């Protein structure tokens, strides 16, 4: 379907008495901006932009330079001097802002965490009043498993993508330093075969089963997870899977929402450098884990999709709507019993 056909189809639906309530945008990479503007010019629907990474700030979506966070604030010649991404990112920002300024009266930016909002809004302070936070998941109940393990051996895991910016290199450094100690068993959870002796690979693919990783962490009684993301994670499903399995999380202070949640929930330790991580395993990791298990700071029994997403559906007047508020002239109604149909635009598939 091309842009013209889509507009004709939506007009036909409107003619039958329906109404396009809202448009949800989940990514701007490779988006046909002209097609998007043609659609928004035709329809007065509310626009919700879901920010899942920092690609609208910089085309280097991790915002890492030489393995370190670039810093808060707007991109500028002074801040980004010598960066290969600067010129293209500045061009993109100018194009985005032209569109956003035109839509200001019906636009809302939705973030999965306060951390993500803080980083993004520091680059776009003029839109901060159009921002809100809706986490991807809700934590339900209490999981009481994996807290009574009195074994003298700790199960230590790396979880998910083995990219350097996710901390795989640091995990291997830790493994190589500690691998001969009988106090640790080493695990990798994901889709790869890491090919490293004494690292047990547990195949997990959440694409086949969304609960696969959580179940695997619980079944294997993982004690410690090294979540050493170098970038400011906007959310981190992996963290919440660890939280729900009562796993002690060790993370870097620059890991974004991972570090924020560890400090908030008290289910791990935030350290300042890889050197501090190595020292922790040399000296006090066992005491830290046993103290955590003794305090029984339980994680959730269930992780459910957050139905607050329904707040981003502008409903008609429904007698069973249970709440309404106005943000930026947008009527936000919340009704957990009713799933409103969402028009989810996949702009990369649109052609001129």
Residues of each region from the PLM?
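Short N-terminal targeting/anchoring amphipathic segment
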Residues: 13-32, 45-50, 224-227
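Membrane-proximal helix-turn-helix segments that form the acceptor-binding/catalytic region
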Residues: 71-109
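Helix-loop-beta element that forms the nucleotide-linked donor phosphate-binding surface
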Residues: 101-108, 117-139
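Conserved donor-binding/catalytic core segment of Leloir-type glycosyltransferases
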Residues: 110, 148-166, 172-175
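Acidic anion/phosphate-binding donor-loop and adjacent secondary structure
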Residues: 137-153
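Nucleotide-activated donor-binding/catalytic signature segment of Leloir-type glycosyltransferases, i.e.
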Residues: 188-221
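Short alpha-helical segment that forms part of, or immediately flanks, the ligand-binding pocket
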Residues: 214-215, 238-245, 259-260
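Nucleotide-sugar-dependent
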Residues: 226-238, 253, 259-260
């Amino acid at each position: 379907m091309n842009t013209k056909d889509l507009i004709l189809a939506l007009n036909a639906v409107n003619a039958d008495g329906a109404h396009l309530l809202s448009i949800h945008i989940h990514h701007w990479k490779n988006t046909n901006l002209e097609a998007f503007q043609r659609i928004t010019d035709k329809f007065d629907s509310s626009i919700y932009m879901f920010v899942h990474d920092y690609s609208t700030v910089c085309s280097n979506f991790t915002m890492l330079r030489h393995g370190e966070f670039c810093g808060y604030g707007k991109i500028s010649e002074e801040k980004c001097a010598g960066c290969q991404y600067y010129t293209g990112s500045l061009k993109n920002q100018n194009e985005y802002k032209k569109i956003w300024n035109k839509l200001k009266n019906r636009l809302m930016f939705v973030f999965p965490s306060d951390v993500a909002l803080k980083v993004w809004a520091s680059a776009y302070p003029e839109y901060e009043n159009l921002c809100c936070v809706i986490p991807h998941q809700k934590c339900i109940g209490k999981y009481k498993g994996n807290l009574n393990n009195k074994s003298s051996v700790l199960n230590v895991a790396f979880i998910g993508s083995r990219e350097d910016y996710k901390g795989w290199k640091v995990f291997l450094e830790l493994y190589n330093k500690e691998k001969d100690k009988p106090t640790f068993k080493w695990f990798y959870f994901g889709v790869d075969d890491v090919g490293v002796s004494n690292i047990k690979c547990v195949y997990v693919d959440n694409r086949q089963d969304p609960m696969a990783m959580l179940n695997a962490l619980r079944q294997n009684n993982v004690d410690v997870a090294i979540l050493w993301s170098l970038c400011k994670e906007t959310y981190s499903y992996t963290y919440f899977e660890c939280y729900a399995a009562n796993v002690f999380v060790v993370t870097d202070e620059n890991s974004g929402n991972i570090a924020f949640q560890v400090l908030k929930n008290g289910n791990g330790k935030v350290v300042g450098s890889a050197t501090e991580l190595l020292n922790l395993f040399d000296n006090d990791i066992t005491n830290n884990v046993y103290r955590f298990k003794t305090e029984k700071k339980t994680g959730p029994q269930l992780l459910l999709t957050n139905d607050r997403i329904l707040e981003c559906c502008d409903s008609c007047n429904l007698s069973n709507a249970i709440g309404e508020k106005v943000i930026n002239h947008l009527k936000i109604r919340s009704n957990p019993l009713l799933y409103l149909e969402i028009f989810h635009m996949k702009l990369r598939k649109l052609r001129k």
